[in-house]
């Protein structure tokens, strides 16, 4: 129906537009022709905006033309007027039908209207009820806010009362002295656990009362008298107990570590005295310091005296220096030496004293050693003495810090009050001993013992001995340097002419140096010290100069070289046993040994093969300068060299080998020298062959008598010593 209405409206508009157009064509815009049945009822039509209206009509028509029914009607050529009337008729029928339906449903509509009216009344009453309810809610919300404010105020009052109650409870609990506390302080022995527990309670109550008194609390006066009497009783019992423990240290043969351990269990006793009776605490501390300082001093003085009795009877003296000859001390009234002076400069097993296992080994027991007739070097006694000192000092320092509740400088001062006299006595004894000590190895080992003990003390977190270690090192280092300088001076001032008969074997002074230097180098490698290396460098220079001075006493260069090689080889061998291969001493003597060995080989080859050596050098020089023609005048000389070498080389090599093996004490070194000499001889003969291959000497008849180089090598290998 909507489509039909749309088509009808569109048809009317088209007809209206078409009629208007026809009228305009036939009669003009204002005329009326015979085709016009009646004038258009314009009514109140506003023609002032006809253009705008026509535009709207155009738009409306254009929209209707898009309708499918209109398009279909236009396509089929239906008469629009007739179609419009038909549609209008249908619309009227529909309208009448709708009216009849409305009339038929009028009762229902009236009933619906009544129902709507009733609903409006109900909704109005609901609105009134909701309004009243909203008003009630507003008043309730106000009451709730009032209740919340009242509740908050009550909570604040409750918390305040609880806080006051807690404070008052604490105050009352702190002021009340229970009967259990009184009975424990008055009757219980101090060693019982309940005495310690109630003593802690008494200390807390006394502190609380002092705090409340400072605030002006009047109730403190009620308990002050009771607490004071209990405090006096507790102080008296504690004082007697601690002094009794301290006095027990004085008993002979008492292990004072046991009472110390017992005191640590009751360290709160001293804390109580410190907080409640400082005069008594000071009395106990002073008594402890006085008692323990005497005990330590007596113990270490006795131990040190007994310890020195098990030292070796034979010790180094001022004449036991590196450059002093063995016969210097022998006199008419002198007794024979129980040891060789060379052992003073030898490390041997003495270095084990600084090994980790020996360093912290149990201390020596002098009477046990005396029964077993055992004797020890000074460094072993020094280690035992200072390990005991280290162990007891660490234990004492930790006890002082824990029992007397001190730390930092206060702990240092208290420690030195206890151990100061003992440490001072030990330093004086060491200073006195070092005055007549000439054993550099012993002093150097003592230095390294101190360095290691200092590290142990640092690991145990005991800094109280730091100053003592510095004082000990301040005594040891200068003495060590002095002894080393004395040895340097003794070597420097040694006159080779006063040493007796000359011998190409290693000298005893160089052997002393080798043993001594290797000992110090091996010890110094563990904790390197630059000053030590400088002093050893000075000693090495003097020993090298001494070796050269002694070598100069030999008449022949060959003997000089044999002496130098034997000494350099011996010193190098000893050093390499203990020092690192890349140490300065090893490198220096290796270079000296190589240089003198090469010179000796040339000196060794010179008598039997000197002519051959001279000719080869001269010929090579001529060839290098381009004067090879001058070799033609050397044919007779070359012939003599060829025949002389061929007839005597075997005997010369045999004599050379025997001479070398007789000259050198180190068989391995002698073998190396023979090997080098034979290698150089082969190289020399090979160079001789190259010279004879020059055109100027190639036609020499004597070349036929040359020994084949490979044959010579095979023969020379037979002279290589085998081990």
UniProtKB/Swiss-Prot annotation:
Task: Spell out which residues are annotated as carrying Phosphoserine.
Answer: 355
The Gene Ontology biological process terms listed for this entry are: endocytic recycling; Golgi to vacuole transport; lysosomal transport; protein transport; retrograde transport, endosome to Golgi
| Presence of the UniProt keyword Cytoplasm in the record | no
> Which membrane topology describes this protein?
Peripheral membrane protein
Q: Which residues form a coiled coil?
A: 107-127, 194-215
* Coiled coil listed as a keyword: yes
Main location group: Golgi
One GO molecular function term of this record is: syntaxin binding
Q: Region (Disordered): which ranges?
A: 21-41
Keyword terms: Acetylation, Coiled coil, Endosome, Golgi apparatus, Membrane, Phosphoprotein, Protein transport, Transport
Subcellular location per the Swiss-Prot or TrEMBL entry? Golgi apparatus, trans-Golgi network membrane; Endosome membrane; Recycling endosome
Modified sites of kind N-acetylalanine = 2
Q: Which InterPro entries match?
A: Vps52, Vps52_C, Vps52_CC
Do you know which Pfam families this protein is assigned to?
Vps52_C (PF20655), Vps52_CC (PF04129)
Query: GO CC annotations?
Result: cytosol; EARP complex; endosome membrane; GARP complex; recycling endosome
The text of the family note is: Belongs to the VPS52 family.
State what this protein does: Acts as a component of the GARP complex that is involved in retrograde transport from early and late endosomes to the trans-Golgi network (TGN). The GARP complex is required for the maintenance of the cycling of mannose 6-phosphate receptors between the TGN and endosomes, this cycling is necessary for proper lysosomal sorting of acid hydrolases such as CTSD. Acts as a component of the EARP complex that is involved in endocytic recycling. The EARP complex associates with Rab4-positive endosomes and promotes recycling of internalized transferrin receptor (TFRC) to the plasma membrane.
Q: How does it assemble?
A: Component of the Golgi-associated retrograde protein (GARP) complex, also called VFT (VPS fifty-three) complex, composed of VPS51, VPS52, VPS53 and VPS54. Component of the endosome-associated retrograde protein (EARP) complex, composed of VPS51, VPS52, VPS53 and VPS50/Syndetin. EIPR1 interacts with both EARP and GARP complexes and mediates the recruitment of the GARP complex to the trans-Golgi network. Interacts with RAB6A and STX10. Interacts with BLTP3B.
Please state what the protein is called. Answer: Vacuolar protein sorting-associated protein 52 homolog
């Amino acid at each position: 129906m909507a489509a039909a209405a749309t088509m009808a409206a569109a048809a009317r508009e088209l007809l209206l537009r078409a009629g208007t157009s026809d009228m305009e064509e036939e009669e003009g815009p204002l005329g009326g022709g015979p085709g016009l049945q009646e004038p258009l009822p314009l009514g109140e039509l506003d023609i002032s905006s006809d253009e705008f209206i026509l535009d709207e009509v155009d738009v409306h028509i254009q929209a209707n033309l898009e309708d499918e029914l209109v398009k279909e009607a236009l396509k089929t050529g239906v008469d629009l007027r007739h179609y419009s009337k038909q549609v209008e008729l249908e619309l009227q029928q529909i309208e009448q039908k709708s009216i009849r339906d409305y009339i038929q449903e009028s009762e229902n509509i009236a009933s619906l209207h009544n129902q709507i009216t009733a609903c409006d009344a109900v909704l109005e009453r609901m609105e009134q009820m909701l309004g009243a309810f909203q008003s009630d809610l507003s008043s309730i919300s106000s009451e709730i806010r009032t209740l919340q404010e009242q509740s908050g105020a009550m909570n604040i009052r409750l918390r305040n009362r609880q806080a006051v109650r807690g404070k008052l409870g604490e105050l009352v609990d702190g002021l009340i002295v229970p009967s259990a506390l009184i009975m424990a302080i008055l009757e219980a022995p101090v060693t019982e656990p309940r005495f310690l527990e109630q003593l802690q309670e008494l200390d807390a109550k006394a502190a609380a009362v002092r705090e409340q008194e400072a605030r002006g609390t009047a109730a403190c006066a009620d308990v002050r008298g009771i607490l004071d009497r209990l405090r006096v009783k507790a102080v008296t019992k504690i004082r007697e107990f601690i002094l009794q423990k301290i006095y027990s240290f004085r008993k002979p043969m008492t292990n004072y570590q046991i009472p110390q351990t017992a005191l640590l269990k009751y360290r709160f006793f001293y804390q109580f005295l410190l907080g409640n009776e400082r005069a008594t605490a000071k009395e106990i501390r002073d008594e402890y310091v006085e008692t323990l300082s005497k005990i330590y001093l007596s113990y270490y003085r006795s131990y040190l005296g007994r310890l020195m009795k098990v030292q070796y009877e034979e010790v180094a003296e001022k004449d036991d220096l590196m450059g002093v000859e063995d016969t210097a001390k022998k006199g008419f009234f002198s007794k024979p030496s129980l040891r060789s002076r060379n052992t003073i400069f030898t490390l041997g097993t003495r270095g084990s004293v600084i090994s980790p296992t020996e360093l912290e080994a149990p201390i020596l027991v002098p009477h046990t050693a005396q029964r077993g007739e055992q004797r020890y070097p000074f460094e072993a006694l020094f280690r035992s003495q200072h390990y005991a000192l280290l162990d007891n000092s660490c234990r004492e320092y930790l006890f002082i810090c824990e029992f007397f509740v001190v730390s930092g400088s206060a702990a240092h001062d208290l420690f030195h009050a206890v151990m100061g006299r003992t440490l001072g006595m030990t330093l004086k004894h060491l200073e006195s001993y070092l005055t007549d000590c000439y054993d550099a190895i012993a002093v150097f080992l003592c230095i390294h013992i101190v360095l290691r003990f200092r590290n142990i003390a640092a690991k145990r977190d005991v800094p109280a001995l730091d100053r003592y270690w510095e004082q000990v090192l301040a005594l040891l280092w200068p003495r060590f340097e002095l002894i080393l300088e004395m040895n340097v001076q003794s070597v420097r001032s040694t006159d080779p002419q006063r040493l007796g008969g000359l011998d190409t074997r290693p000298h005893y002074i160089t052997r002393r140096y080798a043993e001594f230097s290797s000992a110090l180098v091996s010890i110094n490698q563990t904790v390197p010290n630059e000053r030590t290396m400088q002093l050893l460098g000075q000693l090495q220079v003097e020993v090298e100069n001494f070796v050269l001075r002694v070598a100069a006493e030999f008449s022949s260069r060959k003997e000089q070289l044999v002496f130098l090689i034997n000494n350099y080889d011996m010193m190098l061998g000893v050093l390499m046993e203990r020092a690192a291969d890349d140490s300065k001493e090893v490198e220096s003597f290796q270079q000296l040994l190589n240089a003198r060995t090469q010179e000796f080989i040339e000196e060794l080859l010179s008598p039997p093969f000197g002519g051959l050596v001279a000719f080869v050098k001269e010929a090579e020089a001529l060839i290098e300068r381009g004067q090879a023609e001058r070799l033609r005048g050397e044919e007779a000389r070359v012939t003599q060299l060829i025949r002389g070498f061929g007839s005597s080389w075997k005997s010369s090599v045999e004599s050379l080998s025997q001479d070398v093996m007789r000259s050198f004490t180190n068989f391995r070194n002698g073998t190396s020298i023979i090997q080098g000499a034979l290698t150089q001889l082969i190289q020399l003969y090979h160079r001789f062959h190259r010279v004879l291959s020059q055109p100027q000497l190639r036609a020499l008849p004597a070349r036929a008598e040359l020994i084949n180089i490979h044959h010579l090598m095979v023969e020379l290998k037979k002279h290589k010593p085998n081990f």
